[in-house]
Amino acid sequence: MLEQMGKAAREASWHLAQLSTEQKNQALLVIADLLEQQEAIILAANEKDMVAARESNINAAMLDRLLLTSERLKAIADDVRQVCHLEDPVGQVIDGRLLDSGLRLERRRVPLGVVGVIYEARPNVTIDVASLCLKTGNAAILRGGKETHHTNQAVVAVIQQALETCAIPAAAIQAIDKPDRELVAKMLKMDEYIDMLIPRGGAGLHKLCREQSTIPVITGGIGVCHTFVDESADLDQALNVIINAKVQRPSACNSLETLLVHEAIAESFLPQLSDAMAAQKVTLHASQRAITALKKGRATVVDVTEADYCDEWLSLDLNVEVVNDLTAAIAHIRQYGTAHSDAILTQSISHADRFVRQVDSAAVYVNASTRFTDGGQFGLGAEVAVSTQKLHARGPMGLDALTTYKWIGYGDNTLRR
């Protein structure tokens, strides 16, 4: 089955690569319209997944990711329409030069070919990936989690109907709809057909893909994000930034997980932090250096563990540690961070510059929330993932990250001498 899907995807990718921007945009508009027109079918399928998820005692954060509503589906359809307004990178000339030989050389963006995506209980990913791959002329093979089985079937059926309406092969967007985990292991070996693999899920999924895939893998999305409050920070403003980074959307990979506080301000700042977090119903996981001052406020405070520093909370929980200075803060981030998004709150230009130079993360912020690490916020449009590695793509992956390039030489019967 998988080999047939791979062959069909490869064939479809050649067709997609020839489409004009107008043809691709038309297909996207049809997808968006059909998502709304077939709302009842999609939501009924999603309800089947929700019932099964509740019976399996899936946690609240996962249930929220899995849930589709009329409003959410409308927003997803609107997001697909927004992709139409994004600049098509395919065919763009990155650079070029005229060689001494007379050969005119260009480096031009082209589609990757076939993109594989493995993800968990996120039905929106099915549509996000499909729309971005279509815009960039790539075919896609999707493997969603068993939790989204019925929803993905319904959504992919809509997408394929739209593609066929626009005379595009339905195999351009395919989904593995069997929950058999052995199929994941086989998919990881399909380097003959899949050009790039993107896992969207927890650390275990990323580890599996890194260790077993023969396909180039883009890893990321694991966000143990830090903010360091320096001794010179504006503490009132710092509280606002911390609340935004932690509370706005705790389940996001760019939400704040560990707060580091300079020891010079800890006694005065931590009680204020505790009161602010209590108002937001955030539980604080405190080190021995932080716990006494935090308990002077109203928040629920518990002891932090070593494991807490290593994992994403993705909930209204926050680690708090007091550090000696900037050097210690950077050392902590190097030890426990995931190279996703880290921030410093400071009024010291030299400290800000040093933090930016020495913290090796995909996104580093000065006096700003880590929540900005997002394709839409960066002005890239939609994103297919957030990469925390350094090769091919780093940070939010917009349309450009779903392309590669080829060299094109124009001559006049030009010979190499």
UniProtKB/Swiss-Prot annotation:
Family annotation (CDD domains): ALDH_F18-19_ProA-GPR
SUPFAM superfamilies tied to this protein: ALDH-like
Entry GO CC: cytoplasm
Location relative to the cell: Cytoplasm
Alphabetic keyword roster: Amino-acid biosynthesis, Cytoplasm, NADP, Oxidoreductase, Proline biosynthesis
GO molecular function, one term: glutamate-5-semialdehyde dehydrogenase activity
Top-rank lineage group of the source organism: Bacteria
EC number(s) given by UniProt: 1.2.1.41
EC supergroup of this enzyme: oxidoreductase
Catalytically driven reaction(s): L-glutamate 5-semialdehyde + phosphate + NADP(+) = L-glutamyl 5-phosphate + NADPH + H(+)
A Gene Ontology BP annotation from the UniProt entry: L-proline biosynthetic process
Classification via InterPro entries: Ald_DH/histidinol_DH, Ald_DH_C, Ald_DH_N, Aldehyde_DH_dom, G-glutamylP_reductase_CS, Glu-5-SA_DH, GPR_dom
Pathway as given in its UniProt record: Amino-acid biosynthesis; L-proline biosynthesis; L-glutamate 5-semialdehyde from L-glutamate: step 2/2
Family listed: Belongs to the gamma-glutamyl phosphate reductase family.
Protein's job: Catalyzes the NADPH-dependent reduction of L-glutamate 5-phosphate into L-glutamate 5-semialdehyde and phosphate. The product spontaneously undergoes cyclization to form 1-pyrroline-5-carboxylate.
Protein name as catalogued: Gamma-glutamyl phosphate reductase
Organism encoding this protein: Proteus mirabilis (strain HI4320)
